[in-house]
Amino acid sequence: MAAKVKKGDTVVVLTGRDKGRSGEVIQVMPKENRALVRGVNLVKRHQRQTQAQEGGIISKEAAIDLSNLAVADPKDGKPTRVGFRILEDGRKVRFAKRSGDLIDG
C-alpha cells in the first residue's frame, strides 16, 4: 500500500486527548503503523544525567497510530482523505480529496 502520510506532512489528530491539534510529522514507522508528530501526544520521561545532558523530567513526543491522523488540506488546513493521481509527465502524486489540491509536487 502506498504511503498516505509522509515525513514533513502537516496532519490533524482525529481522536484522543489531542483531538483537533495539528503538527508536522517527524517520523513514520510503517511496520508499527505509527507516526511521531511534533507537539502532539507529549509524555513526560525521566532522563538520567549524563556528561552531555542534564538529568530531570523531559517532555517528548510519543508515537500515535496512523488511523488517528488525517493529512491537513493544503487549502484550508482541515482534515482530508488522500488520493493518488498520475500527472501528464508520468509522476504519481498525492492529492487532497476534499479540495483536489496537490499535497506534494
Curated annotation (Swiss-Prot):
It comes from the Bacteria. GO terms for molecular function: rRNA binding; structural constituent of ribosome. It holds the Pfam family KOW. SMART domains: KOW. Keywords: Ribonucleoprotein, Ribosomal protein, RNA-binding, rRNA-binding. Gene3D superfamilies: 2.30.30.30. PROSITE patterns: RIBOSOMAL_L24. GO terms for cellular component: ribonucleoprotein complex; ribosome. Part of the 50S ribosomal subunit. Belongs to the universal ribosomal protein uL24 family. One of two assembly initiator proteins, it binds directly to the 5'-end of the 23S rRNA, where it nucleates assembly of the 50S subunit. One of the proteins that surrounds the polypeptide exit tunnel on the outside of the subunit. This is Large ribosomal subunit protein uL24. It comes from Methylobacterium nodulans (strain LMG 21967 / CNCM I-2342 / ORS 2060).
